[in-house]
Curated annotation (Swiss-Prot):
The protein's name in its UniProt record: Holliday junction branch migration complex subunit RuvB
Amino-acid positions noted as binding Mg(2+) in the UniProt annotation, renumbered to this chain: 99
Region: Head domain (RuvB-H), residue numbers: 288-370
Gene3D superfamilies for the chain: 1.10.8.60, P-loop containing nucleotide triphosphate hydrolases, Winged helix-like DNA-binding domain superfamily/Winged helix DNA-binding domain
Entry-linked NCBIfam families: PRK00080.1, ruvB
Gene: ruvB
Molecular function GO terms recorded: ATP binding; ATP hydrolysis activity; four-way junction DNA binding; four-way junction helicase activity
Catalysed reactions listed for this entry: ATP + H2O = ADP + phosphate + H(+)
A GO term from the CC aspect: Holliday junction resolvase complex
Alphabetized InterPro entries for the sequence: AAA+_ATPase, AAA_lid_4, DNA_helicase_Holl-junc_RuvB, P-loop_NTPase, RuvB-like_N, RuvB_C, WH-like_DNA-bd_sf, WH_DNA-bd_sf
Length: 370
């Protein structure tokens, strides 16, 4: 989300008129690997089965230590009272395991989990069909819950609070409301935009938990486990090499592992060493900091054309040919996380770390902005 200021905004800074003031190593020509480092589910992943590599129990789930402790207490308390779990809202960047957690909760409670997403619930009857078919204690997982239609969301209010479905029959003065009892269930909502949820919906969740990015050591454990399930030989140092470039995201880590596995099977008789992993990821344009071709291009344009910034989002979008929303939602979060980009009231600024990573030397006048 762009940072706004109540003060009058200055005009966009003009492109640097003194290109000699920046030492320019340039961006090597390359064809970016489309979608390899995005945390969104790829079409290939939608078609393939991922259940085989998902952890089935909370004890097998790597990372998110505080979240696991909270959920373990909630599970044990619910089991002792023979009640369903409280409704749970999970928020955070995509690819961190929200769907996996909902499936684990259902497995721990010994119930079924129904998985859907808000865009699939276009009409009120879609959510009604799901709710009336739930069994006592079942888990209903709704991904991208911030995108629920208004009428669908309003149907969830009594369902979540009183396990009741209120259906309006007829129109105008002849309209009447009929209430249908629902079995007690647990709603698990997932969102990347918790601020976009309405207060009435957010307030009906008994547990609200944030998922954080993973440390390289945690991702390394996930990669080693996945490699074992895929019957792939992988050294611990190779797993850590892949983990460092995975943007703190398990989905990306598993995706990179599969691409490295393909490379190793063709080029190195199937065994993945640190050297093989590094060569494969270099081929796929994933650098040691987890930046891909597009990430580096965004920073390079800011540095070469605008002296590192500040520069507006729309200007960056026009200069790179990317949509402003794509830059803001897909590329910027990781650049902000690793400290390569700053958002200021005047625009985006490439940090000193970004200059050094790309091999540039900032001019003296720019150091005050970094």
């Amino acid at each position: 989300m762009a940072i706004l200021s109540s003060q009058k905004q200055p005009l966009e800074p003009e492109p640097s008129k003194n290109p000699q003031s920046v030492q320019q190593p340039g961006l090597p020509p390359s064809t970016p690997e489309q979608g390899l480092l995005t945390a969104e589910v790829s079409p290939e992943e939608r078609l393939s089965r991922t259940d085989d590599i998902r952890p089935q129990r909370l004890a097998d789930y790597v990372g998110q230590k505080e979240l696991k402790e909270v959920l373990q207490i909630a599970i044990q308390a619910a089991q002792s009272r023979r009640e369903p779990l409280d409704h749970l809202l999970l928020y955070g960047p995509p690819g961190l395991g929200k769907t996996t957690i909902s499936l684990i909760l259902a497995a721990e409670m010994g119930v079924s989990c129904k998985v859907t997403s808000a865009p699939a619930l276009e009409r009120p009857r879609d959510i009604v069909g799901l709710l009336v078919n739930l069994k006592p204690g079942d888990v209903l997982f709704i991904d991208e819950i911030h995108r629920l239609a208004r009428m669908t969301e309003e149907l969830l209010y009594p369902a979540m609070e009183d396990f009741r479905l209120d259906i309006t029959i007829g129109k105008g003065q002849s309209a009447r409301t009929r209430s249908l009892p629902l079995p007690p269930f647990t709603l698990v909502g997932a969102t990347t935009r918790v601020g976009s949820l309405t207060s009435p919906l957010r307030d009906r969740f008994g547990l609200i938990q944030r998922l954080r990015f993973y440390e390289p050591e945690e991702l390394s454990q996930i990669i080693l486990r996945t490699a074992s399930l895929l019957k792939t030989e992988l050294t611990p140092s190779a797993a850590l090499e892949i983990a460092r470039r995975s943007r703190g995201t398990p989905r990306i880590a598993n995706r990179l592992l599969k691409r490295v596995r393909d490379f190793a099977e063709v080029k190195a008789a199937g065994t993945i060493t640190e050297t093989i992993a590094s060569e494969a990821l270099q081929l796929f344009n994933v650098d040691p900091c987890g930046l891909d071709w597009t990430d580096r291009r965004l920073l390079t344009v800011m540095i070469e054309h605008y002296g590192g910034g500040p520069v507006g989002l729309e200007t960056i979008a026009a200069a790179t040919g990317e949509e402003a929303q794509t830059i803001e939602e897909v590329y910027e979060p990781y650049l902000l996380q690793i400290g390569y980009l700053n958002r200021t009231p005047r625009g985006r600024v490439a940090t000193l770390a970004a200059w050094k990573h790309l091999g540039y030397t900032p001019p003296d006048g720019q150091l005050s902005l970094l």
